[in-house]
Each structure stands twice: as C-alpha cells, then as structure tokens.
C-alpha cells in the first residue's frame, strides 16, 4: 500500500522581495519628473507595513501604482496588500498606510478546507494547523489537482504550496 503524500498551504511574505520593491519604488519616485516637488516618499512603517506620503491624493495613488508595479515585477502577489480606500490627511500631507497580510485567517482556512472537501470528497484530507493547512492524499495526482483548483479559485489570500512529501 502506498504511503500518504501531502503538502502545506501557507501565506507568507517574501520580505526581501517587498524590501527590494520599496527601494525601487522610492528610487523611481525621487527620479521621475511628475513626482518632482510633490514630496512623495515610500518607506517601511514597522515590520508589516509600508507608508506612502505625498502632498496630493492623486500623487499618493500614483505612488501606490508605482509600488504595485514594482511588486509585480518582483513576483510578489498584490493580494498581500491591505490598502485603505482614501489616504489619511494630516495638514498638507496625504498618508497611505499599507498593511502587509501574512498567514491564512481561520475563516479563509475553513473556506479552503470546505472547497477541497466539496471538490474531492474521497481520498483528500485537509487539516487546519494554525495559520496554514496540510492537505494529504494517497494519490499525488489528487494533490496536483487540488493545487490547480486553488490557483484558479478567486481567494483574497496569496497562497504558496510547500513541504511536498
């Protein structure tokens, strides 16, 4: 009888890639002509937050677009960003605090486990382990089908698949 195969579903942030994107976006904001004199900056605001500052709402949103483009070029999913609808205003400065989401929330973990149970009723088991899920099955083909299904699903979480056994 074949041993069970498994993998883990996690949602982790590659901090080095995000840091590279912040540095590239900061460099572009300082060099681009349309950002001259706007005081637009992008910087880390704690361990899991990035802050964009500018003197107008339009420039703050344009700086956010620059940051998003740098993240995409670095291969980081935009689903990790928690961006407010409008920038916070303090005096003449517009601040856009961006939180980076890491880990799978219990609600999303239950939702993913339910999707797996509905799609693959026999042979595939999903176990919630803190902020990650372990999916196991006797057939590796089923596990590959689960990965394909989750990649095509419209979840608001960036998923990575690790620890294939």
UniProtKB/Swiss-Prot annotation:
Statement: the UniProt record of this protein carries the keyword Nucleotide-binding: yes
The question of whether Nucleotide-binding is a record keyword is answered with yes
Please list the GO terms describing molecular function: nucleotide binding
InterPro entries assigned = DUF520 (IPR007551), UPF0234-like_C (IPR035571), UPF0234_N (IPR035570), YajQ-like_sf (IPR036183)
> What domain of life?
Bacteria
Sorted UniProt keywords? Nucleotide-binding
Listed GO cellular component terms?
cytosol
Which residue stretches, if any, does this entry annotate as coiled coil?
Answer: none
Q: Known SUPFAM superfamilies for this protein?
A: YajQ-like
Q: What does this protein do?
A: Nucleotide-binding protein.
**PANTHER family from the entry?**
UPF0234 PROTEIN YAJQ
What family does this chain come from, according to its entry?
A: Belongs to the YajQ family.
Entry protein name: Nucleotide-binding protein Tfu_2672
What's the source species for this entry?
A: Thermobifida fusca (strain YX)
């Amino acid at each position: 009888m074949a041993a069970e195969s498994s993998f883990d579903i996690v949602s982790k942030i590659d901090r080095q890639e995000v840091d590279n994107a912040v540095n590239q976006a900061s460099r572009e904001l300082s060099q681009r002509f349309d950002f001259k004199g706007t005081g637009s900056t992008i910087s880390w605001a704690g361990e899991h937050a990035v802050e964009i500052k500018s003197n107008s709402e339009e420039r703050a949103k344009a700086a956010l677009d620059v940051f998003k483009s740098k993240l995409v070029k670095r291969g980081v999913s935009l689903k990790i960003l928690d961006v407010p609808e409008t920038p916070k205003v303090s005096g003449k400065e517009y601040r856009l605090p961006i939180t980076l989401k890491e880990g799978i929330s219990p609600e999303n973990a239950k939702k993913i486990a339910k999707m797996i149970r509905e799609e693959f009723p026999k042979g595939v088991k999903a176990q919630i382990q803190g902020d990650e899920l372990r999916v196991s099955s006797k057939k590796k083909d089923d596990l590959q089908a689960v990965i394909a299904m989750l990649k095509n699903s419209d979840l608001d979480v960036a998923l990575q698949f690790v620890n294939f056994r």
